[in-house]
């Protein structure tokens, strides 16, 4: 687990390119590490079957079958589709030590992972809706 985002990414864009692609909330969350307010994101209470993907690069991140209601106001999942698609980064902001999760392909801030999730992993990936897109299962 690293403490900085210094690794090369598959998808690299300028700030202007990210701003043109993303809406203002998506940009602040994914590129500056902001957090949307609890219970306001479009996927907080979304239960359709399918795959949630990175809004920045479309990398598939979470299957709807791993989503659960954590009662926290953000979409929560107990595991990513593939462990290697998520980077874990030590986050020491706001006087806390947490584990930030980012998209490995484009470096988008997704949210944080906590050790209080359900079986089988015991982890809770607490993810901002603004960092996600969704593809329904066919």
Curated annotation (Swiss-Prot):
Tell me where the signal peptide lies: none
User: Which keywords appear in this protein's UniProt record, sorted alphabetically?
Assistant: Metal-binding, Oxidoreductase, Zinc
Active site residues of this protein = 126 (nucleophile)
Annotated EC = 1.8.4.12
* Reactions this protein catalyses: L-methionyl-[protein] + [thioredoxin]-disulfide + H2O = L-methionyl-(R)-S-oxide-[protein] + [thioredoxin]-dithiol
What is one term from the GO cellular component aspect held by the record? cytoplasm
The EC category is oxidoreductase
Q: Which residues form the MsrB domain?
A: 15-137
Q: Where are the transmembrane segments?
A: none
Recorded superkingdom: Bacteria
Cofactor dependence: Zn(2+)
Q: Where does Zn(2+) bind?
A: 54, 57, 103, 106
Query: Per UniProt, what is one GO molecular function of this protein?
Result: peptide-methionine (R)-S-oxide reductase activity
Any coiled-coil ranges, and where?
none
Protein's UniProt keywords contain Ribonucleoprotein = no
Name the GO terms of the biological process aspect: protein repair; response to oxidative stress
Cofactor comment in the record?
Binds 1 zinc ion per subunit. The zinc ion is important for the structural integrity of the protein.
Which PANTHER family is this protein grouped with? METHIONINE SULFOXIDE REDUCTASE, METHIONINE-R-SULFOXIDE REDUCTASE B1
Q: Give the protein family.
A: Belongs to the MsrB Met sulfoxide reductase family.
User: What protein is this chain from?
Assistant: Peptide methionine sulfoxide reductase MsrB
* Organism this protein belongs to: Methylibium petroleiphilum (strain ATCC BAA-1232 / LMG 22953 / PM1)
Lineage of this protein's species? Bacteria, Pseudomonadati, Pseudomonadota, Betaproteobacteria, Burkholderiales
Which gene is this protein's source? msrB
């Amino acid at each position: 687990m690293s403490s900085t985002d210094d690794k090369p990414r598959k998808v690299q864009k300028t700030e202007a390119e990210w701003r043109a692609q993303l809406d203002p909330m998506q940009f602040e969350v994914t590129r500056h590490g902001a957090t949307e307010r609890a219970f306001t994101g479009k996927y907080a209470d979304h239960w359709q079957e399918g795959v949630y993907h990175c809004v920045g690069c479309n990398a598939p991140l979470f299957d709807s079958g791993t989503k659960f209601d954590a009662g926290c106001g953000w979409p929560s999942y107990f595991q990513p589709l593939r462990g290697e698609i998520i980077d874990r980064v030590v986050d020491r902001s706001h006087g806390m030590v947490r584990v930030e999760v980012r998209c490995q392909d484009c470096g988008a801030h997704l949210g944080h992972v906590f050790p209080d999730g359900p079986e089988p992993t015991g982890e809770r990936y607490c993810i901002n809706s603004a960092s996600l897109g969704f593809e329904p299962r066919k």
